[in-house]
């Protein structure tokens, strides 16, 4: 993948706010300089007055999301279809919210992530435009999914997804009706209009905006179109039954009781390694992070043209916080502008005219400070956000520089040593490896708890729980609890909505202390597959203050390189799970597309897609068994199908470069309120009581992933297939294959021996079943299948000379 050098193009969206307004926000700190130099950041924590909020935005379609990304808006990894478009969530200050409204965006109410949840935006009834029945062509309906499921408090829901052959016409309206259970009529259970889902201007399929609450599990559903099409299908149950009681030995769980910072999490893992040396080892990853540290700064001035800020050469923790700067009025006439240094005290004596008035401009002060060799060893001076600096500066008292960091002394200011806890009885590379990793995004406080809880359960249940013992004995498990430790510390103690790491690539025009909450690289946009540097959507390569800033080039960040090092150094890793929040998603590759023509990264083949879906049913059933949370079918699937494009994400990196089967959790499913009939989002940092429950249920999911991995590792059963004729008419016969388990089918139609180079059974389309193959004359079909674990049907050797493949003649009338 190509990389580019350091780039400092258009500034982040917040820079679009008028400069005088930005200065007005920080005026109190500028007008009254003090020894603590309290400069208000442009973006303050949610809990502060005029701080950022988690805001709803409704856009018409995915192109609106792409535009928000291009503007550098800080979007949550959350989307929800609504009747008039797509709802997304963004971290915005009041000024940023208004600036987006001025640009025509529908910025709506705030979602509290501190416990007081706002209701979801009101759904308006779908307007069905009448179509002339006599002129409308009858469309064909393909039902993609029809399922019912239960969630919290045993509330039942219905999910249906249908593709219409006339779906590209925005006037196509689909209506679903269902029965009320066995022996009841279609329609007795309810009727609902479906929403038309488009992405990047292309029709995808129709679905419900939200799963529909129902009172009884339906058996069948009928979908009708205003274009004349109709289809009736069976409604299946989504997710399985509860796990059986493990036996007389109680399964122990619940090992987290508060949100933990990365220092605490690492100490917990270090303690586990010491307590269980026979089953674990700690791996020090090779690339230390930049660390929870910043240069110290001070800012002087009340207007853009006369403002100067200084930045220490050393980090604040390494002496930068000991530097002082003063701007002195000499009190004499015709004084020259001079700079002097005594120890770590920098004194700027401002120039005056014949009347004794100060004449030094901001640009002149900057040049004088930077031109003084002794001062330049300590700090650099800059004008405010690229201003020419023609305004006259004001005198200021001795001011101490500060790095503005608030974490306690227990949080080191040195580069952070990331550690992986390796768990397994046999840690020699002979067992299938599974990589579980959490908190790529700093503000997602629940996610490291999922990794901690998973590790604790594996080790503390090993002695007495047979299922846990099988997992640990048969797998090689790698758990990285915090991918982004610097950003996570910053989120915990300085700015709760920090998403990125703390590395500042901004030029001086965006490096003043007011910008300090807008620096860093999005780790989950810094990988090398499907990246913004290759033209994919969902990250910024030019705005260093964008919350999806991908960095100066692919894999520029040590956090991302550590992930790559781990999976390269341990090639036995075959499966992975990346835990994020929020929204209740379960996803897999592909995760990115190019905007032009919605060019998606290559989709996985049908055998792998079937494996993802089959595994999902098992994994999500384990999530559900904790307290009833059901991950919606509409939030399950490839990232590009159910969320949006996320250029340069880690799951794509590991799948396309190494073939690692990887999933993404988004913990924190929306909570249904039966009193209001609405779903409420939980946010990044819910009250701990809710965060605890999310950690418990998704730790269940992690254990289930390990069970799936063990089944993969121990699978010696060969798949079985059969050829099924699905359609016969004069001159043509359509057929497909059915398999006993997720498997790829290779076939020939010319009588030749099938090999891995032969045509492979494909999917009929996005979220559809397998394709139908049509022949126009009597044809001998030869085929074999291979499952995900590599077992070949009938022990056939595709690269050999044997003939023990399947054969069947398909007749044509």
Briefly describe each language-model feature range:
Residues 739-741:
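Short glycine/proline-centered coil/turn motifs in the loop regions
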Residues 342-349:
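Strand-loop-strand motifs at the edges of beta-sheets in extracellular beta-sandwich domains
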Residues 314-341, 370-375:
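Ser/Thr/Gly-rich low-complexity blocks that favor extended beta-strand/coil architectures
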Residues 2-34:
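Secretory targeting and sorting signals
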Residues 32-309, 315-320, 349-736, 755-780, ...:
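M14 metallocarboxypeptidase catalytic domain recognition
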Residues 745-748, 783:
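A short aromatic-rich beta-strand->coil structural motif
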């Amino acid at each position: 993948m190509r990389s580019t050098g350091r780039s400092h193009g258009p500034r982040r969206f917040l820079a679009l706010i008028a400069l005088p307004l930005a200065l007005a926000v920080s005026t109190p700190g500028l007008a009254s300089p003090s020894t603590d130099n309290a400069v208000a950041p442009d973006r303050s924590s949610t809990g502060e007055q005029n701080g950022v909020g988690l805001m709803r935005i409704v856009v018409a379609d995915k192109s609106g999301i792409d535009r928000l990304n291009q503007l550098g808006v800080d979007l949550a990894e959350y989307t929800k279809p609504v009747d008039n478009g797509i709802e997304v969530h963004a971290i915005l200050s009041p000024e940023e919210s208004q600036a987006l409204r001025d640009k025509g965006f529908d910025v709506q109410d705030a979602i509290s992530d501190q416990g007081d949840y706002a209701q979801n935006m009101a759904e308006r009834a779908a307007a069905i435009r009448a179509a002339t029945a006599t002129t409308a062509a009858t469309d064909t309906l393909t039902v993609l999914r029809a399922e019912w499921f239960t969630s919290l408090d045993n509330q039942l829901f219905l999910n249906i997804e249908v593709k219409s052959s006339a779906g590209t016409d925005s006037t196509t309206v689909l209506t679903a009706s269902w029965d009320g259970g066995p022996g009841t009529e279609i329609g007795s259970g309810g009727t609902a209009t479906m929403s038309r889902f488009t992405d990047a201007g292309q029709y995808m399929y129709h679905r419900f905006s939200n799963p529909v609450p129902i009172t009884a599990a339906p058996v069948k559903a009928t979908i009708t179109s205003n274009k004349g099409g109709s289809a009736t299908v069976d409604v299946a149950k989504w997710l399985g039954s509860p796990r059986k009681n493990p036996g007389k030995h109680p399964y122990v769980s619940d090992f987290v009781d508060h949100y933990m910072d990365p220092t605490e999490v690492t100490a917990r893992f270090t303690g586990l390694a010491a307590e269980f040396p026979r089953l674990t080892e700690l791996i020090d990853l090779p690339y230390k992070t930049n660390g929870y540290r910043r240069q110290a700064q001070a800012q002087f001035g009340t207007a853009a043209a006369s403002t100067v800020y200084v930045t220490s050469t050393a980090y604040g923790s390494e002496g930068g916080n000991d530097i002082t700067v003063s701007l002195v009025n000499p009190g004499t006439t015709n004084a020259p502008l001079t700079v002097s240094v005594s120890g770590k005290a920098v004194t700027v004596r401002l120039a005056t005219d014949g009347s004794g008035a100060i004449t030094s401009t901001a640009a002149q002060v900057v040049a004088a400070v930077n031109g003084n060799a002794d001062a330049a060893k300590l700090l650099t001076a800059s004008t405010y956000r690229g201003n020419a600096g023609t305004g006259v500066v004001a005198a200021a008292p001795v001011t101490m520089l500060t790095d503005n960091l608030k974490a306690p002394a227990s949080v080191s200011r040195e580069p952070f040593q990331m550690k992986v806890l390796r768990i397994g009885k046999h840690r020699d590379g002979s067992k299938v490896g599974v990589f579980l990793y959490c908190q790529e995004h700093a503000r997602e406080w629940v996610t490291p708890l999922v990794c901690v809880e998973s590790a604790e359960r594996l080790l503390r249940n090993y002695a007495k729980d047979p299922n846990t013992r099988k997992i640990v004995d048969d797998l090689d498990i790698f758990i990285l609890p915090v991918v982004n430790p610097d950003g996570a510390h910053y989120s915990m103690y300085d700015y709760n909505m920090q998403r990125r790491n703390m590395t500042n690539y901004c030029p001086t025009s965006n490096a003043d202390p007011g910008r300090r909450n807008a620096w860093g690289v999005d780790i989950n946009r810094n990988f090398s597959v499907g990246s913004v540097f290759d033209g994919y959507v969902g990250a910024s390569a030019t705005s260093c203050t964008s919350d999806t800033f991908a960095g100066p080039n692919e894999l520029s960040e040590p956090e991302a390189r550590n992930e790559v090092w781990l999976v390269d150094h341990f090639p036995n890793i075959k499966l992975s799970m990346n835990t994020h929040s929020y929204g209740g998603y379960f996803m897999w590759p592909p995760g990115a597309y190019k905007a032009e023509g919605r060019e998606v990264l290559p989709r996985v083949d049908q055998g792998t897609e079937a494996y993802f879906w089959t595994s999902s049913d098992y994994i999500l059933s384990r999530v559900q068994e904790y307290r009833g949370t059901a991950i919606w079918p509409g939030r399950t699937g490839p990232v590009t199908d159910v969320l949006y494009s996320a250029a340069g994400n880690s799951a794509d990196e590991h799948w396309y470069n190494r073939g690692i089967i990887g999933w993404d959790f988004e913990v924190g499913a929306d909570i249904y309120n039966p009193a209001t009939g609405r779903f409420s989002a939980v946010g990044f940092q819910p009250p701990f009581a809710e965060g605890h429950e999310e950690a418990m249920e998704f730790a269940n999911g992690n254990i289930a992933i390990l069970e799936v991995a063990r089944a993969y590792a121990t699978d010696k059963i060969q798949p079985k297939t059969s050829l099924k004729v699905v359609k016969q008419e004069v001159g043509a016969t359509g057929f497909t294959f059915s398999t006993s388990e997720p498997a790829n089918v290779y076939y020939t139609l010319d009588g030749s021996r099938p090999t891995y180079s032969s045509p492979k059974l494909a999917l009929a389309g996005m979220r559809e079943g397998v394709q139908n193959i049509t022949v126009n004359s009597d044809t001998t079909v030869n085929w074999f299948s291979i499952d995900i674990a590599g077992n070949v049907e009938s022990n056939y050797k595709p690269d050999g000379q044997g003939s023990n493949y399947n054969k069947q003649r398909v007749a044509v009338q």
